[in-house]
């Protein structure tokens, strides 16, 4: 059996119900590890009753000499009260015993504050004055152990303390034994396993619905005409008339004006008389024939010139019409090439953005895989039985390795 200064072999938990009954539960066994939650030492004062904490009546204590136990009991007696102490010891090797009954006598107050207890048993009686210190009383696990195998056949001593006082109690009140103070530290290592992801190929597909309808209608209307002008051919002047106008200024403020007109006749009257009117008619016919010949030749030349001008005008018009069609085709080709260029730019931008996002994802995953994360946890709970402190720290460290293998390049003929 464990001694006072050695590690306890079992750790127990005490639950107290509304009626004050205690229920002892076994938490675990000490297997020799350095666990502060299970390997705690008894820190009770040396002047207390062996095997029991302050303010709690022990029901099982270790075997001690009778005079030493009596000396420790006499140290707790009050000088102002007269008490009768009766002590009886019983040696037994059996683990069965009768639980003592507790009664409280004294003033009504908080639990465990200056109270007096009366314990009675069917086997032995004694008296002592025991006063609890505060609400931080601790019950020894060895004193509450009801496992008969823990005695190992050793001699035990049972002491029942009966306290009598002149103060009359107004009611029954029981001291609730609480679990001894424990400091527990939990160390938990969580291993996160990440399975290798299958290689995946992301194909960005953009659904495109294209409606194309081409209908070209070309209509050409042309008209070429020439406005003819009248050709005036003047007759040749052989001898024009002579007109003279002269003004003469004379002295004395007088002036004189002279008008003279001279008509020239090429043929003399004698010659006219000699040629006769028939000759004159022949002359006039020849002159008219020459005029008609000249007019016909001029008209023919004008028609040829007009035809050449009209042909050139038609050629210029047709050239301009072809230029119109070429302009339309050029504009259509310019629009198509501009749209194709913008599509290629958008495709390149999308590819670059996807690569950038993939790189960001790889960097973020690598940073998280190789990073160390820690969290400090501090819990403080104030309750009726005291203040509970719980502190912890969670640290996560991960490391990952990624390998990439590239196969031979393959070319597909489209």
From Swiss-Prot:
Polar residues composition bias: residue spans: 142-155, 388-405
Keyword Cytoplasm: yes
Domain of life: Eukaryota
Region (CAHS motif 1): 305-323
Entry keyword Transcription regulation: no
Keywords tagged on the record: Coiled coil, Cytoplasm, Repeat, Stress response
Coiled coil: 341-376
Cysteine pairs bridged by disulfides in the record: none
Region (CAHS motif 2): 342-360
Residue spans of biased composition, Basic and acidic residues class: 27-45, 69-84
Compartments reported by the entry: Cytoplasm
Chain intervals for the UniProt region annotation (Disordered): 27-155, 388-414
Family membership: Belongs to the Cytosolic-abundant heat soluble protein (CAHS) family.
Domain notes: CAHS proteins contain 2 repeats of 19-mer peptides designated as CAHS-motifs that comprise each two octapeptides connected by a tripeptide.
UniProt miscellaneous comment: Trehalose, a disaccharide essential for several organisms to survive drying, is detected at low levels or not at all in some tardigrade species, indicating that tardigrades possess potentially novel mechanisms for surviving desiccation involving tardigrade-specific intrinsically disordered proteins (TDPs).
Purpose: CAHS proteins are cytosolic heat soluble proteins that seem to contribute to the anhydrobiosis in tardigrades, but their specific mechanisms are yet to be identified. It is possible that protection during anhydrobiosis might occur via the stabilization of vitrifying small molecules such as sugars, but not via the direct glass transition of CAHS proteins themselves.
Protein name stated in the entry: Cytosolic-abundant heat soluble protein 89226
């Amino acid at each position: 059996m464990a001694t006072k200064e050695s590690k306890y072999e079992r750790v127990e938990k005490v639950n107290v119900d509304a009626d004050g009954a205690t229920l002892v539960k076994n938490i675990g066994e000490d297997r020799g590890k350095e666990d502060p939650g299970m390997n705690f030492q008894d820190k009770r004062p040396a002047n207390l009753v062996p095997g029991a904490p302050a303010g709690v009546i022990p029901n099982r204590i270790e075997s001690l000499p009778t005079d030493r136990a009596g000396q420790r009991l006499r140290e707790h007696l009050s000088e102002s009260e007269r008490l009768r102490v009766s002590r009886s010891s019983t040696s037994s090797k059996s683990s069965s015993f009768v639980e003592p009954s507790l009664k409280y006598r004294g003033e009504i107050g908080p639990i465990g504050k200056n109270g007096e207890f009366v314990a009675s048993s069917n086997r032995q009686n004694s008296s002592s004055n025991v006063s609890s210190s505060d609400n931080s009383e601790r019950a020894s696990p060895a004193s509450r152990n009801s496992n008969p195998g823990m005695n190992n056949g050793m001699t035990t001593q049972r002491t029942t303390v009966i306290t009598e006082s002149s103060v009359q109690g107004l009611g029954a009140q029981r001291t609730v034994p609480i679990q001894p103070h424990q400091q527990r530290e939990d160390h938990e290592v969580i291993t996160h396993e990440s399975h290798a992801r299958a290689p995946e190929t992301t194909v960005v597909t953009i659904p495109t619905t294209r409606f194309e309808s081409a209908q070209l209608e070309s209509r050409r209307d042309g008209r070429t005409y020439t406005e003819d002008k009248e050709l005036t051919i003047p007759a040749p002047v052989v001898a024009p008339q002579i007109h003279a106008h002269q003004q003469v200024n004379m002295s004395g403020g007088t002036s004189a004006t002279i008008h003279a007109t001279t008509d020239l006749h090429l043929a003399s009257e004698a010659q006219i008389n000699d040629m006769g009117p028939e000759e004159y008619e022949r002359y006039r016919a020849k002159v008219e024939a020459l005029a008609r010949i000249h007019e016909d030749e001029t008209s023919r030349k004008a028609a040829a010139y007009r035809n050449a001008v009209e042909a050139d005008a038609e050629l210029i018009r047709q050239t301009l019409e072809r230029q119109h069609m070429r302009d339309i085709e050029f504009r259509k080709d310019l629009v198509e090439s501009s749209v194709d260029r913008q599509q290629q730019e958008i495709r390149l931008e999308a590819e670059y953005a996807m690569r950038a996002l993939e790189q960001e994802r790889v960097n973020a995953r690598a940073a998280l895989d190789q990073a160390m994360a820690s969290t400090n946890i501090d819990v403080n709970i104030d309750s009726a039985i005291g203040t509970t402190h719980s502190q912890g720290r969670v640290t996560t460290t991960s490391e990952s390795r990624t390998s990439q293998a590239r196969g031979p390049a393959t070319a597909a003929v489209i």
